[in-house]
């Protein structure tokens, strides 16, 4: 069935221009690229764009640390990012920057329309201000104690321990991340986007059925909580676009970042002249399709602020958001210390791009699920699927065709019904690519690969080749195998661009979706060359080690206590919550006969007595001095039978050991039995 050609604009979230691309980023760009390549194979007009997100305080401060201008830093980072994406064969039509004249003009245009339409409000707010650096502090540049769970060293917008959200002014004992100074409160006039005015429109958009169910459900929670006005301004000093007629005020990075999609496309239109129309894709009544591939961490901005901004400034809204989950490696969060925080460029020094493209694709679906890159499974799957099932199908047949028949395929199919089974699968596989059910598409393709290899096994061309008078049979069998290989590679073309190029060179024909309906008969193929090499765990080990070495090279050496006693593996809040810490009064302290390390402590928990053995004797030669002190103990530690008796808990102490052990004590006012929270 012939499809009507569509005009489609596809974007990926804009990478922030203060760091390298890593394998977490690559999931999204690979997912989008596979989808885009499939759309192009089906004859649709696709414009695939991206840009660097190049504004904000973090970029300004990092440039200062490096002793260069922000413009120089983002320019160098853009080149690095584009090199990485090209290395993974991401087929962007344009890659730009939010720090561009196109983006400035569009940001000012959208702001002016929102203002004219009454959606921009002014009001004075109180903010934390760094008196040493002379700057207002964004949320992430303030740290202090969480006002909810009292965990120290938490950012100014949310607690990474208990998950609570709050404003920077709610932090206990806040400190500037920039200078370490205690911030002060200062008033400043800010500009707010009236998001609540768009609640009805956004709810209708949510109910349209276009969005993923998980996204729609999350949006409904936000609607029920009530939408708030959105602060779209920041005070100088700030690296970004100054707001028109508001000296010293700048657009918040999240205002001009999504407009960067438009800016990059405008840049592409200007390059191509009349062949692409900006208005055709962005005007209010546009019939072109607009899709944003994004991670689940930025759904809020793309599902609420962005469509509301577009609606309020008379531009079209996205057709849909395609949201994905995070990447874990070997079942855990990417870790620099374990060597699993892997940069895109590091990967390409050890593996080809097609291998990761295939592994991610095989695991992706249309749901917002996290993807685990299990490196051992990665090696096994790439070898089993790409090498053993697909490439091997070509290699085990091509030799006979090249040597015995001068590269010419048979003039008829040996098994037309089997070939029809392969071509009939185009509809199911195509629908899976279209609906982003990538894992399903791969499973369907590999099931066909199994059928193809079973055919070759049953026909045994290596046996036929030794039998006189069966040259025609040999040519027919091997030609059938090569034709089935051609169909498989056509289905895999969106995923494996480099392998596809080599396959097309061997087959001496371009692989097209509709082309498989006509098998290659009497066709001359080129001499077969190895299409793909097996991979092994030694490459994985080298990759992990290289990632560790990169971290060492870019990280200042740790000195002091952390050098001798590194921080342990991360635990979850649920794990931490199991530990019951209590204030205890030391009623008695005495030596333990037969031990030169232990003291026996009698602790009062406020109505309950505990006997605890503690290895602090070297630091407290006079145990009587501890009597009457308050300390902290682990109250729910299972009793431990020791040679000297049963220890019913553990007291908390710090220090490297020996004489340098320091028993922890609470502030004055804490009572025995109080829980430490």
From Swiss-Prot:
Give a Gene Ontology cellular component term annotated to this protein. cytosol
Q: Does the keyword Iron apply?
A: no
The chain's coiled-coil residues are none
| Motif 'HIGH' region, residue range(s) on this chain | 15-25
Alphabetized, the UniProt keywords read: Aminoacyl-tRNA synthetase, ATP-binding, Cytoplasm, Ligase, Metal-binding, Nucleotide-binding, Protein biosynthesis, RNA-binding, tRNA-binding, Zinc
Binding residues annotated for ATP, in chain numbering: 336
Subunit relationships = Homodimer.
Write down the NCBIfam families for this protein, in alphabetical order. metG, metG_C_term, PRK00133.1
Protein's recorded name: Methionine--tRNA ligase
**Which species is the source of this protein?**
Shigella flexneri
Traced from the root, the source organism's taxonomic lineage reads: Bacteria, Pseudomonadati, Pseudomonadota, Gammaproteobacteria, Enterobacterales
């Amino acid at each position: 069935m012939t499809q009507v050609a569509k005009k489609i604009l596809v974007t990926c979230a804009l990478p922030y221009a203060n760091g390298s691309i890593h394998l977490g980023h690559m999931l999204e760009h690979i997912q989008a690229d596979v989808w885009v390549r499939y759309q192009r194979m089906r004859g649709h007009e696709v414009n695939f764009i991206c840009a660097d997100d190049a504004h904000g305080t973090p970029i300004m401060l990092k440039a200062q640390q490096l002793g260069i201008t922000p413009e120089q830093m983002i320019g160098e980072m853009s080149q690095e990012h584009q090199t990485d994406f090209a290395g993974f064969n991401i087929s962007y039509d344009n890659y730009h920057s939010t720090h561009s004249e196109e983006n400035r003009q569009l940001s000012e245009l959208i702001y002016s329309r929102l203002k004219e339409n009454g959606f921009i409000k002014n009001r004075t707010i109180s903010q934390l201000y760094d008196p040493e650096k002379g700057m207002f502090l964004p949320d992430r540049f303030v740290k202090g104690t969480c006002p909810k769970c009292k965990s120290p060293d938490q950012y100014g917008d949310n607690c990474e321990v208990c998950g609570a959200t709050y404003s920077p002014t709610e932090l206990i004992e806040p400190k500037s991340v920039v200078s370490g100074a205690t911030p002060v409160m200062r008033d400043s006039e800010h500009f707010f986007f009236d998001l609540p005015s768009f609640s009805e429109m956004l709810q209708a958009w949510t109910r349209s059925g276009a969005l993923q169910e998980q996204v729609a459900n999350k949006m409904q929670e936000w609607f029920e909580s009530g939408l708030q006005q959105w602060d779209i301004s920041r005070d100088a000093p700030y690296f970004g676009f100054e707001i028109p007629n508001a000296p010293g005020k700048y657009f918040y990075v999240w205002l001009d970042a999504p407009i960067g999609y438009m800016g990059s496309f405008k840049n592409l239109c200007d390059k191509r002249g009349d062949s692409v129309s900006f208005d055709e894709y962005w005007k209010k009544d546009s019939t072109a399709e607009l899709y944003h591939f994004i991670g689940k961490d930025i759904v809020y901005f793309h599902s609420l602020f962005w469509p509301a901004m577009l609606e309020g400034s008379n531009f079209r809204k996205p057709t849909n958001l395609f949201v994905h989950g995070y990447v874990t490696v070997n079942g855990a969060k990417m870790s620099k210390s374990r060597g699993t925080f892997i940069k895109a460029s590091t990967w390409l020094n050890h593996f080809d791009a097609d291998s990761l493209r295939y592994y991610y694709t095989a695991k992706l679906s249309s749901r917002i699920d996290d993807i685990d890159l299990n490196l051992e499974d990665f090696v096994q799957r790439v070898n089993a699927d790409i090498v053993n099932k697909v490439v091997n199908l070509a290699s085990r047949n091509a030799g006979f065709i090249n040597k015995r028949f001068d590269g010419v395929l048979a003039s008829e199919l040996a098994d037309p019904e089997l070939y029809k089974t392969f071509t009939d699968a185009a509809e199911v596989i195509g629908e899976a690519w279209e609906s982003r059910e990538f894992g399903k598409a791969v499973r369907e393709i590999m099931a066909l690969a199994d059928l193809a290899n079973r055919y070759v096994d049953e026909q045994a061309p290596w046996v036929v080749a030794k039998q006189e008078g069966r040259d025609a049979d040999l040519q027919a069998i091997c030609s059938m195998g090569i034709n089935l290989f051609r169909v498989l590679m056509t289905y895999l073309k969106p995923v494996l661009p480099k392998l596809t190029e080599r396959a097309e060179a061997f087959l001496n024909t371009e692989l097209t979706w509709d082309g498989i309906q006509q098998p290659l008969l009497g066709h001359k193929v080129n001499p077969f060359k190895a299409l793909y090499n097996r991979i092994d765990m030694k490459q994985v080990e080298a990759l992990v080690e290289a990632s560790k070495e990169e971290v060492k090279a870019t990280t200042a050496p740790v000195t002091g206590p952390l050098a001798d006693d590194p921080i342990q593996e991360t635990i979850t809040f649920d794990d931490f919550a199991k530990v019951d810490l209590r204030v205890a009064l030391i009623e008695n302290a005495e030596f333990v006969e037969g031990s030169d390390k232990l003291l026996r402590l009698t602790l009062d928990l406020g109505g309950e007595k505990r006997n605890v053995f503690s290895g602090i004797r070297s630091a407290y030669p006079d145990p009587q001095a501890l009597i009457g002190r308050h300390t902290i103990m682990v109250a729910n530690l299972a009793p431990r039978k020791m040679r000297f008796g049963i220890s019913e808990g553990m007291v908390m102490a710090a220090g490297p050991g020996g004489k340098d052990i320091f028993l922890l004590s609470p502030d004055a006012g804490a009572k025995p039995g109080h829980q430490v929270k």
